[in-house]
Amino acid sequence: MNAWNTIYERFNPIAFSLGSIEVHWYGLAYACAIVIAFYMALRMIQKDPKRFPVARKDFESYFLWAELGIVLGARIGYILIYEPNSSYYLTHFWQIFNPFDSHGNFIGIRGMSYHGGLVGFLIASYLYNRKDLKKLLIYLDLIAISLPLGYVFGRIGNFLNQELVGRIVPKDSHLGQMIGIVVDHELRYPSQLIEAFLEGVIVFLMVMWAKKHTKTHGLLIVVYGLGYSLMRFIAEFYREPDSQLGVYFLNLSMGQILSLFMVIVSLGILLYATKNSKKIKEN
């Protein structure tokens, strides 16, 4: 065992406390993710106004819609897909966003689904642009290029919060023995960091490549969707399946199945973009 393997034994997921309210590193990481995504988008608007012909005040309004859609979709998606007591929440809807436990202690809102957040994001984006759908693909492209680096911090937050842990490392995996993290006396892959790299850094590079080589609105969000789906599908082989769900046909996890649906949605957006989007004008 090396020092990295046992890092959780020396790390507190709580960053600090404000009275009875405990502030977790995950919450701080999520806040960083939002800030990074926001300012990354503003930078893209400033640097490439032909691809992103959006006024800052309009983007600020849209960003609020998008973030609200993500949070609502992520939480509701978790309840519908992953929560074993979903029937309780469906009959006590106000409890879905209740940050306090039965004793009145602040515990925050726990349980978010990325794919649920994606659905909420798409719905919010459509509602915001419903009167001018020509701008929809521009906004989606803007989020596609600004989201991945923020996503890195989200997964780092999962790691710091000691959740969404990886699968048990095989004893004959030399690399796994080096990078694994001890969780409940088992050496597991740091799947959160693997996801941060694959679904964040690699997907960001994919979208940046597409930005350089494509001239049609809507293609960046397609590249993001396909790239994320592929990277998530791979990363799931290192992530422990949700205990309440397990695996399905062909030993696929729920994350992998939802990623396949994400491919279908991305191809649908591609079809829409090729039929309805205009070429980006050159200088």
UniProtKB/Swiss-Prot annotation:
Subcellular localization(s) per the UniProt record: Cell inner membrane
GO molecular function term, any single one: phosphatidylglycerol-prolipoprotein diacylglyceryl transferase activity
A single BP term in Gene Ontology: lipoprotein biosynthetic process
GO cellular component, one term: plasma membrane
Highest taxon, organism lineage: Bacteria
Pathway: Protein modification; lipoprotein biosynthesis (diacylglyceryl transfer)
Protein residues bound to a 1,2-diacyl-sn-glycero-3-phospho-(1'-sn-glycerol): R155
InterPro entries tied to this protein: Lgt (IPR001640)
Major localisation: membrane
Disulfide bonds: none
Membrane topology designation: Multi-pass membrane protein
Alphabetically ordered keywords of this record: Cell inner membrane, Cell membrane, Membrane, Transferase, Transmembrane, Transmembrane helix
Pfam families: LGT (PF01790)
EC number(s) on file: 2.5.1.145
Positions of transmembrane segments: 21-41, 62-82, 106-126, 136-156, 190-210, 218-238, 252-272
Task of the protein: Catalyzes the transfer of the diacylglyceryl group from phosphatidylglycerol to the sulfhydryl group of the N-terminal cysteine of a prolipoprotein, the first step in the formation of mature lipoproteins.
Family (UniProt): Belongs to the Lgt family.
Record-given protein name: Phosphatidylglycerol--prolipoprotein diacylglyceryl transferase
Organism whose genome encodes this protein: Helicobacter acinonychis (strain Sheeba)
Taxonomic placement: Bacteria, Pseudomonadati, Campylobacterota, Epsilonproteobacteria, Campylobacterales
